[in-house]
Amino acid sequence: LEVLGVENVEFKTENEKPCIVSIHKNGTLNNAASNLDVLLTNMILEEEDKVIFPEGEYTLPMTLPLDKSITIQGTGQDKTIIKGAILVNGSANNTATDVKIKGLSIDYTPTKVTSGKCTPIIEVTGNADLLIDNCIMNNNTQGYGDRKNPNPAEALQNAILLGATAKGTVRVENTTINLAANAQSGVLIDGELTDVSLVNTKIDGQVNGSNQFGVYIHHKKTPVTVDSTTILLNNHYCIYANNAGDQKLTIKNKSNIVGYGALYLYETSDMNVHVSGGSILTGKTKNKGVSDSFAAIAISTNNSTVGASNNEIVIEDSYIGNKFDEQETMAMTPIKINGSFTPTPCDNKIILKGKTIVSTTDNIKNPTIVGYGMNPD
C-alpha cells in the first residue's frame, strides 16, 4: 500500500492511540506504530526519511543509531519526551550525513562506569552535519565516567559528545541543556569539525558540585560560535579550551556567560577569541563560597611543555566583570594570567574596543584589571 502526502496526517490505532510515523523523502509512508519497540523492529530507515513522534513519553530500548540522513521530529519540547541516548554515526567519506533532531525533550540517566566513557545523550562519530533545534536535554546522571582518565570524553558525562572521529558541522539552536550533577559537560568537542555553533541556546548547571563545563573544547582547529546564548554554572568553567588552539572562538549577540571562569584558555595557544555585541562574561565565586575567587577570563599552564601563548582576545562593545554570591573575602581580577609555571604564558594579546566595560568589585580602592599569579584550582 502506497500512501502519499502523509506528513500532516495523524495515524491512530484502533483504540485511538497516536502512532509514531516514518515517512520517506518523497512523502510516502514507510511505517507507523504506537509502540516504539514494534516500530524499531519492523522499520528500515532510508536516506532522508523523517520519523515523527506524537505527544507522549517514549523509552528507547537501547542507544538509537542514526547512520543515514534522518530527521527525528517531535511535537514540541514540552510534549514529546524520549528517554535514552542517540548515536549519530556519520559517514566515513567526504559526504556528510544530514541529521536533524527537532521539537522534543531527551531525558537520560546513564549507568555509572569505572572504565571507558559514560554514555552521552547524543554522540557524534564520523562525518555528519547535525542540527539540534527546539529541544530540551536533561543530563540526569548521578554517576561518572572514569574520573581519573585525562580524556574528558571518558572522565565526564557529556550531554553532547563530538567524538575524536567527528567531522562536519554541529548546530544547537533554541535548545536548553540541563546539567544536574558533578562531572558533566554540555558540549564536548573532541574532534576536528568544520563548525560548532550554539545559537539562542542555554546551558544551565546551577547546582552545587564540581567539575562542570558548558562548552569544553578539547581539540585544535574546530571553529566555535556562541551566539545569543546563555551559560550559567555554579562551578568551574563555562567555556573551557584545554589543549586546544589554532582556531577561532566567537561569542556574540548578547551572550551571557556566568561561572567560576567564564572563559578559560588552559595550555591552549594560537586561539583567536572575539567577544562582541553586548555580550557579558562574568567570573563568580564557586558554589557561593566566600573565599573561592577566580576571573572572567583566564589564561594559564600547569608546568608543562604545552604552553599558553600567542592567543588574541578581542572584547568589543561587551562587559567583563566579577560577581560574588556571598560575602567577599578575596580580591578577584576580571582577567587572570598565570605566570607561575614554565613555560610562562607569553605573547598573549587582550584588546578592548568600542564601548567595552571591565569591572572589578566596588570596595577595592586600587582594583587590578589583569592579574598574574598561581594557577586556579
State each model region's role.
Residues 85, 112-123, 143, 157-161, ...:
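Structural detector of coil-to-beta-strand junctions
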Residues 27, 48-71, 77-85, 235, ...:
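N-terminal extracellular ligand-recognition/capping segment immediately after the signal peptide
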Residues 142-161, 166-168, 172-218:
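Solenoidal tandem-repeat scaffolds enriched in leucines and small polar residues
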Residues 268, 290-345:
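Intrinsically disordered, low-complexity segments enriched in Gly and acidic/Ser/Thr residues
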Residues 109-115, 140-156, 206-210, 283-294, ...:
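Acidic/polar low-complexity surface segments
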Residues 3-54, 59:
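Acidic Gly/Asp/Thr-rich repetitive segments characteristic of extracellular carbohydrate-active
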Residues 70-121, 134, 139-146:
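Right-handed parallel beta-helix/beta-spiral solenoid domain characteristic of secreted/periplasmic
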Residues 6, 56, 75, 85, ...:
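Solvent-exposed loop/turn tips at the surfaces of repeat/solenoid architectures
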